[in-house]
Amino acid sequence: MNQKYSYIYNKVKSMVAKAMFSTLFPLLPLSMGISTLTSCGAEDSISRRFHCRFTFHTQNHPGNTLEIALNGFGTYTFVSASYKNNIWHIYSTPNDGRNKTEDIRITAAPELQYAKVYNLGANNGIIIGNSNFNKYRAYDRQCPNCIDQYGGTNFPLNWNSANRQQVICAKCHRIYDLEYGNIIDGADGSRLMEYSLSYGTATNGTGKVISVYN
């Protein structure tokens, strides 16, 4: 290559390198920012609008539908609690299409200490289960958008008969997907109020414990 063409080649090479650097360099902090926002978003997905505290010892209730929901895929159940005739009751209504509610009595002494401080979100109702991607999920059973629009906390979600891995609000007709808690049909708005859920062996090594909290 003669001197003239060598000069032109090096000049073009230098210009291309500068162009690539000027294009890519501004994207570096942007990509770092996106990564940071993503990790922060995961932490911020837990709702603290209403207090949630629920603990359930599965070993005292073999075959219970709460545990069945956590051991499946795309399986969920509505959970609520009440205190009647000096006994705590846990009610569980799975999305299995049978429309049956299990009544679980809490009578064991170790469980009663937890029952006294049950607080199941906005209006005594949560949804727990396991997603199709093996991710435990827990949501408030109230429609967050109707709470925002109308006030109060009496907007319970029910299973969508067309797809029981979804819930629907009778008031606003929004449909929420339980995989991620997002609105998949209806007006724009907030996703479901999500809570943390842990499911593991009890500290004393006897059986497993389900805990939902924020």
Residue ranges and their predicted role:
Residues 35-39:
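C-terminal motif of bacterial Sec signal peptides marking the signal peptidase cleavage site
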Residues 27-33:
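Short, basic, low-complexity termini and linkers enriched in Ser/Thr/Gly/Pro
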Residues 146-179:
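Conserved binding-pocket/active-site segment within a compact domain
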Residues 2-27:
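Bacterial N-terminal signal peptides that target proteins for export
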Residues 44-159, 195-214:
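N-terminal pre-ligand scaffold of iron-sulfur
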Residues 121, 160-162, 169, 189-192:
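Short solvent-exposed loop/turn micro-motifs enriched in small/polar/acidic residues
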